């Protein structure tokens, strides 16, 4: 057959051929001598050839006289032969249909069963039955013969109906017997040939008896197993008088048999279930009852299901060398087994034919001979079934037609592409195995000579075992990839590889075969056999094992692992021999043990765990919370709780109670109770106080006992069937802050009173309630308000309830009344009774946070002695909850110590805790609340709802949105966005974009058009990184928008000098490791116009500086010359020419408000470097002269921009009226910075990108790199540009600054300790504002602002206040080991900012002296005054920064 033409070559594609069975053979039961037909019929356009198999062997029907093939394909067997030693016809038959050009298919297997010789295993016997009862006559035969059994009554055939019923076994049931049922019965087997008769037996019908007869089962139901669709019969024959009535239940529910289609009663009580289904499985109960009694009998019904297909194999197209999978899903009961057949022959699993996922067939490395029909044959105990599919292998140049989803593995037709005419690629070059392991090999190669770039080439790697002609294929995952990993190989096996390149025209030449052998697999030891563990004592276990049977090399040692059951942590110990005894274990505790053997290659296979429990011992602790309650005059009830968990040391078998009279401590009585937690001690004396203690027992003995606890029996047996009566009297005596309450008991002394309840409150007695002992007769209510009206109520109570209250009121005395002495209390007779007041709540509750899920609660108990030792049976209850969500319920736990470890809490969650104490039946109120917040934990869930959208109008810009993790476990401090074009790439190969934690959206720019990108997001808190989100795919649009040119220019001009670098607010730094910025910088001016402006400003500035410098130099006084000459004589001979050609323009101190230019002292350096400090007005003023450092800026510039928060900065606004503004040569900055000094060890550290939400991240200390390294107007030669970026950060070396700090008259500090670099923040502030900055005033006019001044010895300069410059001077490229910089803002600061002393310019009255001749020097007294003035200015600025 031919089908549609291939879209690749136009050749005709063969279609699948319908080929299947119309009728398949079924199981047959036959008898000797009968004829049998096994039906079989198949369909195919080409008439198939039919053959038959018996027991897996083809039958030769040509020479067989008894078997013949009918025209429709059925098999006829004439005169079935069957004897004891010759059974040629019985067996399993299978029909095989073959079409020569296609293949073969086989039918299901059918069983032919031949009934055996007729014989009876039991025969009818004489029996009698009462009229109306049911009778049964046995005739047991083989199961095969049961269908051939019939019955005769008085030698006449017996007709069967619902009352007279034949069981499947052949027995006869007669229900509701009548007189006509009496007679002689026999059963007959008619299985062909002469019938075989059983013996005759008489059935007698008896009249009803005069007395009732007991019910008895004549035949009970027995459990059955049936196949779906069969009938099931549960016989149930009961006899007795009166005649019993039989009914049935299924799984305890009444079974309705009337009007049911499938359930019916036969012969008076037997249950018939027709067409059994799986829903019929269960327990069936036959219930027979009459007026006198009821009897029951049960039986189970199990149902088996033949195999059924849930998923049938599908037809598959494939190419040679591909891997395919035929899927087959079956069900049945018992679970079916599956085998596969190809063209009628069973498929034997091998390296290339594998059974995967239980039932599926995987064929690896297809070859042409694999074509044909594949059948999945499922079989269980009750049947079999088959389903098939066709495999067609196409030529490599023929594309696989589009079909419903077929089961192809990863090696599909991805290597095929629509073929066009053109040159094909040559063979790939230099195919080598770069990594060879035991089960995988990595291959790499070079592109073909015909296509050296190879960007559009894909590759197919064909490989096979050496000596086997079945090749498999693996394709590269993306175009241009020149390596592949071949996995699932066999160890120590030689494989042959070849690589074929493919372009849009088709497959090219194959590379030369490459033979590679996989590594042999390391032979590790197997599991140690016969591992055994037995407990030697309550705290030790001995483990033994034998030497592993497998392994390569000598066993070096063993490692024994053991773990307490229910715990997560496993412990281990190294063992040299074959046994070990572990000590120090817990008593009567289950432990699991396993052993791992080690050889020179490492650990082997672990043994299975063996579990053993340590031996029991006497309990190690006493029972808890023993309470006593007098029941009457002769008995006391004891209640207690078991010893604490972990102290039982075995199974508690009982409790030993010891008690004695308090007056006779030597006379002790013992009572042994069971495992219950209470005991009533009877036979006690009236009105006598007894001591009790209790101890727990195990089979090993008795553990420690509790402390003695006392209780007193009643004087007389009182009534506790009703509540007590009202107390006979109530008296109150108010004091200033307390009221003394006294009372007398109820007049009726015959009712039990177990205590009194006192209620009180201002205006109402229900505010507070106190319960006291029944012996108490007075109580002082404390902590009341003076001059307040209190209502007091008193009620007696017992176990039935509270009695009638008695009310009284009192007004506490005012504060002025100091008479607090109550004569009534003093003179009242003392009664030694237990403390009647309620227990005081614990105090000093504290919550100590230990981890992210654990908090330790501690408290104190004021009712204990000062040493806080617990000597009684009190216990504490700890409760805790969190208020999020609001309706959270309290959780509680009990403790017998003064601390408790609360575990299982949520990270970063605020909990509240309170404690109460309980002693016997008395409990305190809850203590005051303590709070604690658990520590943070790394996020345990990824950010959610990650979405990616394209920015409108900018197809190369995308916007990533997300939501915080549902389990953040702390404050999210940042996110990291990973993106890549290869979802399978290693994570370290993905591009990252850090984002601050308060942002849930981020833009990524300069992406490639029409390219799929994959995005993942990872959240971070103070504890670390959380898990990554699932990859989200987004394909960028195909079309380019109108802003393409600015984007392209921005990314393409880096390093070419075509336009100045734009450092405006829109500047976005590049990705880490990328040379092109993912941003869209734009310039408000045309690049040519901007260049002209920059050059003009630079020239004008140089001219002005030169003129001012010459003017200042000529006014230097001769006295200054003498001073400098004296300094030179000490430091060495430094000649300094005063020629005009050597004069450099001095740095100028610019008073922004006074608009004055003040020269600073001249530097002694031989080659001083000039630095201008103009006043920037807006962000446009700081455009650099040249953008040759463009690429460096891209690499170094920090993208962290934004407005600083007010609370993170000190303010200088309050001092602006007193101090002149000090400007920096950079872009506009926030008006109120904090200036702090930080040592920066390296300026080339890789920096991360941060979002522009705020100036500084509280969790990072990344360097803020300088934006514009050049002041406006500074002229630079081409030779200076090479190190332009670095020179701004570098400190002058010793070559350019020969006057080092070791010189006594030097005017500058050591470069390593004093030099600084200004690191600019980003620019997003208002352009009209300027940054107030600080300058250090040097002592020489030509010295740069970068070099701080050091006062001469003996000056008033304070050395404890460091002077930090804000701008370094330019210097040639020299290595700098350490640079100290002054940074703006709170950049990663973890401590208060260091005080910075910044001297200001001198006052106006000093102008004349400063403008004298440059060769002059200060007088000593003038220097002293100047230094004192500088010191005052530095202290002022220090006060400002610390404020």
From Swiss-Prot:
| Region of interest: Disordered | 1026-1082, 1123-1145, 1159-1191, 1220-1339
Taxonomy of origin reads: Eukaryota, Metazoa, Chordata, Craniata, Vertebrata
Originating organism: Gallus gallus (Chicken)
- Which named protein is this? Neogenin
Q: Which residues lie on this side of the membrane: Extracellular?
A: 1-1090
Fetch the PROSITE patterns from UniProt: FN3 (PS50853), IG_LIKE (PS50835)
Please verify whether the record's keywords include Nucleus: no
- Biased region (Polar residues) positions are 1072-1082, 1176-1191, 1284-1304
Q: Known InterPro entries for this protein?
A: FN3_dom (IPR003961), FN3_sf (IPR036116), Ig-like_dom (IPR007110), Ig-like_dom_sf (IPR036179), Ig-like_fold (IPR013783), Ig_I-set (IPR013098), Ig_sub (IPR003599), Ig_sub2 (IPR003598)
């Amino acid at each position: 057959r031919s089908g549609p033409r291939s879209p690749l070559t136009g050749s005709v594609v063969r279609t699948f051929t319908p080929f299947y069975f119309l009728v398949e053979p079924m199981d047959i039961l036959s008898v000797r001598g009968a004829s049998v037909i096994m039906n079989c019929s198949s369909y195919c356009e080409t008439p198939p050839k039919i053959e038959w198999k018996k027991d897996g062997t083809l039958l030769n029907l040509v020479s067989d006289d008894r078997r013949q093939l009918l025209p429709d394909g059925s098999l006829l067997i004439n005169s079935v032969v069957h004897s004891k030693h010759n059974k040629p016809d019985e067996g399993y038959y299978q029909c095989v249909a073959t079409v020569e050009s296609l293949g073969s298919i086989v039918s299901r297997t059918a069983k032919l069963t031949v009934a055996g010789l007729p014989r009876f295993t039991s025969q009818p016997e004489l029996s009698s039955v009462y009229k109306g009862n049911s009778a049964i006559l046995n005739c047991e035969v083989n199961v095969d013969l049961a269908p051939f059994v019939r019955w005769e009554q008085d030698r006449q055939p017996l007709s069967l109906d619902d009352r007279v019923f034949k069981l499947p076994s052949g027995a006869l049931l007669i229900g509701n017997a009548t007189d006509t049922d009496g007679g002689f019965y026999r059963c007959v087997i008619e299985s062909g040939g002469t019938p075989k008769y059983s013996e005759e037996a008489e059935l007698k019908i008896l009249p009803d008896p005069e007395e009732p007869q007991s019910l008895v089962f004549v035949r009970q139901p027995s459990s059955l197993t049936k196949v779906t669709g069969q009938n099931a019969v549960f016989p149930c024959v009961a006899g007795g008088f009166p005649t019993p009535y039989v009914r049935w239940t299924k799984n305890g529910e009444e079974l309705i048999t009337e009007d049911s289609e499938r359930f019916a009663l036969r012969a008076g009580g037997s249950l018939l279930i027709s067409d059994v289904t799986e829903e019929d499985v269960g327990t069936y109960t036959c219930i027979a009852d009459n007026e006198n009694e009821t009897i029951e009998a049960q039986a189970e019904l199990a149902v088996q299901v033949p195999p059924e297909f849930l998923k049938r194999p599908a037809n598959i197209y494939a190419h040679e060398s591909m891997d395919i999978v035929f899927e087959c899903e079956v069900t049945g009961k018992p679970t079916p087994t599956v085998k596969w057949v190809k063209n009628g022959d069973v498929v034997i699993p091998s390296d290339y034919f594998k059974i995967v996922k239980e039932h599926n067939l995987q064929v690896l490395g297809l070859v042409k001979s694999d074509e044909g029909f594949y059948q999945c044959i499922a079989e269980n105990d009750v049947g079999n079934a088959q389903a098939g599919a066709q495999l067609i292998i196409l030529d490599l140049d023929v594309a696989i037609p589009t079909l419903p989803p077929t089961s192809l593995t990863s090696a599909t037709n991805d290597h095929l592409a629509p073929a066009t005419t053109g040159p094909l690629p040559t063979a790939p070059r230099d195919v080598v195995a770069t990594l060879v392991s035991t089960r995988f090999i990595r291959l790499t190669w070079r592109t073909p000579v015909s296509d050296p770039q190879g960007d559009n080439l894909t590759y197919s790697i064909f490989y096979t075992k050496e000596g086997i002609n079945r090749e498999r294929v693996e394709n590269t995952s993306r175009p241009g990839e020149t390596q592949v990993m071949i996995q699932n190989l066999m160890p120590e096996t030689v494989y042959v590889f070849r690589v074929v390149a493919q372009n849009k025209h088709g497959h090219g030449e194959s590379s030369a075969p490459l033979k590679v052998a996989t590594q042999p697999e390391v032979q590790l030891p197997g599991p140690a056999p016969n591992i055994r563990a037995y407990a030697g004592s309550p705290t030790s276990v001995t483990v033994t094992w034998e030497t592993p049977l497998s392994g390569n090399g000598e066993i070096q040692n063993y490692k024994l692992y053991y773990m307490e059951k229910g715990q997560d942590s496993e412990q281990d110990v190294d063992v040299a021999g074959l046994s070990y005894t572990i000590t120090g274990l817990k008593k009567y505790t289950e432990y699991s043990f396993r052993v791992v053997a080690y050889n020179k290659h490492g650990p082997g296979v672990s043994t299975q765990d063996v579990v053993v429990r340590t031996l029991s011992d006497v309990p190690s602790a006493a029972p808890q919370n023993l309470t006593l309650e007098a029941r009457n005059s002769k008995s006391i009830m004891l209640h207690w709780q078991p010893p604490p968990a972990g102290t039982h040391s075995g199974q508690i078998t009982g409790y030993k109670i010891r008690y004695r009279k308090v007056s006779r401590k030597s006379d002790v009585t013992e009572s042994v109770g069971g495992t219950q937690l209470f005991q009533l001690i009877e036979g006690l004396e009236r009105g006598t106080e007894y001591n009790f203690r209790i101890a727990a027992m195990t089979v090993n003995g008795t553990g420690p006992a509790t402390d003695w606890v006392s209780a007193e029996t009643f004087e007389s047996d009182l009534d506790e069937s009703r509540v007590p009566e009202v107390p006979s009297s109530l008296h109150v005596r108010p004091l200033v802050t307390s009221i003394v309450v006294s009372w007398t008991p109820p007049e009726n002394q015959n009712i039990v009173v177990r205590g009194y309840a006192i209620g009180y409150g201002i205006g109402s007695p229900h505010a507070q309630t106190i319960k006291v002992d029944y012996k108490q007769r007075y109580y002082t209510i404390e902590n009341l308000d003076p001059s307040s009206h209190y209502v007091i109520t008193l009620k007696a109570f017992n176990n039935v309830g509270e009695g009638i209250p008695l009310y009284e009121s009192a007004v506490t005395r005012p504060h002025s009344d100091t008479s607090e002495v109550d004569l009534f209390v003093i003179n009242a007779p003392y009664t030694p009774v237990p403390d009647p007041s309620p227990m005081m709540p614990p105090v000093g509750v504290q919550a100590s946070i230990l981890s992210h899920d654990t908090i330790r609660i501690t408290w104190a108990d004021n009712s204990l002695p000062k040493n806080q030792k617990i000597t009684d049976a009190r216990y504490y209850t700890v409760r805790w909850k969190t208020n999020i969500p609001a309706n959270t319920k309290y959780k509680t736990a009990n403790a017998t110590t003064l601390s408790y470890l609360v575990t299982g809490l949520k990270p970063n969650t605020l909990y509240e805790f309170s404690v109460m104490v309980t002693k016997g039946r008395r409990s305190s109120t809850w203590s005051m609340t303590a709070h604690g917040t658990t520590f943070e934990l790394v996020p345990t869930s990824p950010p959610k709802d990650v979405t990616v959208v394209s920015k409108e109008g900018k197809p190369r810009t995308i916007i990533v949105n997300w939501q915080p993790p549902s389990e953040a476990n702390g404050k999210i401090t940042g996110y990291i966005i990973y993106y890549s074009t290869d979802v399978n790439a290693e994570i370290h190969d993905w591009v990252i974009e850090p984002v601050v934690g308060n942002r849930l959206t981020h833009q990524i720019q300069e992406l490639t058009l029409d390219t799929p990108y994959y995005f993942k997001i990872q959240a971070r808190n103070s504890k670390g990184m959380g898990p990554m989100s699932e990859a989200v795919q987004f394909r960028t649009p195909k079309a380019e928008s109108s802003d393409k040119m600015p984007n392209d220019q921005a990314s393409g001009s880096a390093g070419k000098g075509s336009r100045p670098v734009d450092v405006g607010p829109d500047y976005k730094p590049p990705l880490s490791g990328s040379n092109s910025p993912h941003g869209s910088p734009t310039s408000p001016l045309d690049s040519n116009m901007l260049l002209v402006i920059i050059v003009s400003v630079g020239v004008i500035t140089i001219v002005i500086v030169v003129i001012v410098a010459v003017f200042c130099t000529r006014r230097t006084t001769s006295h200054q010359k003498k001073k400098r000459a004296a300094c030179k004589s000490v430091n060495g001979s430094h000649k300094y020419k005063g020629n005009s050609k050597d004069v450099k323009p001095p740095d100028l101190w610019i008073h922004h408000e006074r608009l004055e230019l003040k020269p600073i002292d001249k530097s002694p350096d031989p080659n001083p470097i000039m630095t201008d400090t103009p006043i920037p007005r807006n962000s446009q003023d700081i455009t650099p002269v040249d953008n040759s450092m463009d690429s460096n800026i891209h690499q170094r510039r920090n993208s962290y921009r934004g407005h600083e928060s007010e609370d993170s900065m000190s303010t200088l606004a309050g001092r602006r009226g007193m101090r002149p503004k000090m400007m920096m040569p950079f872009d506009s900055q926030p008006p109120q910075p904090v200036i702090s000094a930080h040592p920066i060890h390296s300026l080339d550290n890789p920096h991360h990108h941060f979002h522009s939400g705020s100036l500084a991240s509280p969790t990072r200390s990344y360097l803020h790199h300088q934006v514009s390294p050049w002041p406006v107007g500074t002229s630079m030669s081409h030779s200076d540009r090479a190190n332009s970026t670095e020179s701004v950060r570098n400190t002058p070396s010793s070559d350019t600054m020969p006057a080092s700090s070791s010189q006594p008259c030097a005017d500058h500090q050591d470069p390593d300790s004093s030099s600084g670099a200004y690191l600019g923040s980003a620019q997003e502030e208002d352009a009209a504002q300027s940054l107030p900055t600080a300058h250090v005033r040097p002592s020489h006019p030509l010295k740069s602002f970068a070099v701080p001044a050091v006062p001469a010895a003996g000056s008033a300069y304070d050395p404890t206040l460091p002077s930090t410059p804000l701008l370094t001077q330019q210097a040639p490229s020299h290595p700098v080991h350490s640079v100290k910089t002054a940074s703006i803002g709170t950049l990663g600061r973890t401590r208060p900012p260091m005080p910075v002393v910044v001297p200001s310019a001198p006052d106006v009255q000093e102008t004349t002296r400063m403008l004298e001749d440059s060769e002059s020097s200060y007088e000593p007294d003038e220097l002293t005054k100047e230094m004192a003035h500088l010191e005052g200015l530095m202290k002022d600025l220090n006060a400002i920064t610390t404020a």
